[in-house]
């Protein structure tokens, strides 16, 4: 189960055009987004370490998204 709250994902699905959203669908989307975000975060951390920094900066996230 995702650590992120499910309600924002229900809103995202409705904003995308869904009239109704099952809890399971919102939970599944939350899990998928969390997995993707974790991979981006891991890459950003590695980029910060490579730059000899302990702080992850916006540019690390941007670079991670490009990879």
Swiss-Prot record:
Key words, A-Z: Chromosome, Cytoplasm, DNA-binding
Subcellular location: Cytoplasm; Chromosome
GO CC, one annotated term: cytoplasm
Keyword Repeat: no
Sequence similarity: Belongs to the archaeal histone HMF family.
Subunit structure: Homodimer or heterodimer with another histone. Dimers then assemble into higher oligomers, with the DNA wrapped around the protein core.
Listed name of the protein: Probable archaeal histone 2
